[in-house]
Amino acid sequence: VYGSVVTAGIHRAPSIKVAEAAKVIENTQRDLNIAFMNELSLIFQALEIDTGDVLAAAATKWNFLPFTPGLVGGHCIGVDPYYLTYRAEKAGYHPEVILAGRRINDEMGRRIARECIRGLLRRKGRGGLVTILGMTFKENVPDIRNSRVIDIIGELQSFGVEVQIADPLADAAAVHEEYGIGLTAIEALRPADAVVLAVSHDQYLAGGWPLVQGLLSEESGLVLDVKMKLDRASKPAAIELWRP
């Protein structure tokens, strides 16, 4: 069946178990690579050096794997490691590295929210209003399944911070049904104290700094660039930028 539609070739696994295990470890490997980046970003933040600068330098080595820090959601990468660890434990083996990676990635949304709160308190002495750009689980898709942006939202709200969310690709009714939150059209957003670029849709990146700065209540607002996509060289001088 697959051979009739797949032109890149087919690898015939010896059993369905092997095929399923292969798919699970593909996603688990990616999850662990991102967890490594997220942990490195914690280390480099403590050392007061920019993670993006370190990764750019490391990428000059031909065999360095190009992963970046960020949220890990969706119906594959953030889920499959738990299938694997569950079956491993049923078979009598307790995984350590895989679960450690999951803990790091599961904490990333709350970490971003706390960095936002710290920035707001440092600048204004209060929480204020935060605009979150993006609700889908990754860039340039409408899929909201297991989006970890909800972790940022929940943590901010738990500290009394008001949040408004915009995403041109996500279906507002589906978001409300799945997460119990509303979306706001980008042109209807109120000027905010901070902007979190949580999902780097091409539409946001095309708008660049003028778009982001236009969403702030003051020219000297706080911006959190989760995937390090905004060009630092063209950042308006008054804006405070946080990157993982």
Language-model features and meaning:
Residues 1-244:
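Structural/interface elements that position substrates and couple domains in central-metabolism enzymes
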